[in-house]
C-alpha cells in the first residue's frame, strides 16, 4: 500500500498528528487576507497531483483511524446514520459511486469486481472482502448507505430533490461541526441553514440552492468551509457538546499552538443516477496552529483573517471568546509582508518570516 496509515486517536489522549506531507496538502480555505461568506462553488474536476482535490474521494494517512472513530460513534449513537424509506435507491447509488471511484482512483487499496448484479468489494486497509448482490439489501450487513459510509472518510448528507428544493432525507454524520442529523433529518435546504448569520441577508443560500439544483450527473462541484476546534476532535456534535464545549476553556498561551486546530470541510456535490438525489460529502481536515505556522503564507494570512472577521461570524464559528488568545499567538507569525493570491502554500516563492 502506498499510503502509510497513522495509528491515532481523535478523543481522550488525542494522538492525532499530521505528517509533513499532510500539512503541505492541507486544504487551507482562505484565498486572500480576509473572509466573508460566499457561494464559492467550483467544478470538482480534480486538482494538482497529490492535493486533496486530485481524486473524487480523498484517502489519506488518517483513513483507518477515522473509520475506527466512526464505528465508536455509531456504537454509542446509532441515530448518527439515518435514511428515510424512500432513500434506499439513493443509498445504492452512493455505494456504487464510492466503490467505483475508489477502485479506479486507488487500485492498490480497493478492488471492485462486477458480474451483472453479483459484486465483490475488497477494501485492503480495513481488511474487508465482501460479495453481495447489488440492489439486494439482504446480502449486506447494513443498508447500502451505511455499509459504504462506514468505509469512507467524511460525512454524507443524501439530499432528495423535489418541489424546487433539497431535503436532507438520509445521511451518515459523525464528524460534523456542531449540527445534528437527528435534528435536521427531513428538513429542506433553507431550514437546515437557518442558524447561519449574515449569509441569508446577502442572498447567498438562494444562489447556492439554484446552483445545486442544476448539478448534472458526471459534473460534480466543490467548495470549502471552515471553523475552529480545540483539540483534534472529529465528533463535535450538539449531542456531545457537554463533552467538547468545555475544552474551549483549556487554552493557554503555552498550549494554544498545539491544541487549537483549524477545521476545514471539503464539501463536494454529486448527482446520483437512478434516484436523481444529490449526495453532499463533507470531508473534515484538521491542522493545529503550530503546524499551519510552518507555512509562512498561511501564518500571515490566518492572523489577518481571524483579526478582521466580523463579530457575528466569529461568534457563529464558536471562537469569539478565544479570539484574543488566538491573535496573541498568531501575530508572532505575521510580519506584515504581502501574501500571494490563492490557497496554495507557495513554499518556493513566499518569503520566510521576517520578524
Predicted features by range, described:
Residues 1-355:
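Extended, well-ordered protein cores
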